[in-house]
Amino acid sequence: MALSVEEKAQIVNEYKQAEGDTGSPEVQVALLSANINKLQDHFKANGKDHHSRRGLIRMVNQRRKLLDYLKGKDVSRYTALIGRLGLRR
């Protein structure tokens, strides 16, 4: 269920701000979004998996916090990111 090393590297390369950047809000939000999408597919087949659902809710909350932080720091980066990821709001 977790992202493979190749998938993570591809996401980091796509959303990085500078060479060697793995911790910027854009990269973190993109990685969380990919994990969230994978878990949503898992719940279509395993609806009663409440332990994983708790992890999903935690990831959604962490992504929301990072997006709020980015919105407060730089609105243009925030709007560009949610546009690229196809998120609401």
UniProtKB/Swiss-Prot annotation:
InterPro entries per record: Ribosomal_uS15, Ribosomal_uS15_bac-type, uS15_NS1_RNA-bd_sf
Single Gene Ontology BP annotation: translation
Keyword hit for Lyase: no
SMART domains linked to this entry: Ribosomal_S15 (SM01387)
HAMAP family in UniProt: Ribosomal_uS15_B
Membership in a protein family: Belongs to the universal ribosomal protein uS15 family.
Description of how the protein assembles with itself and partners: Part of the 30S ribosomal subunit. Forms a bridge to the 50S subunit in the 70S ribosome, contacting the 23S rRNA.
Protein name according to UniProt: Small ribosomal subunit protein uS15
Gene: rpsO
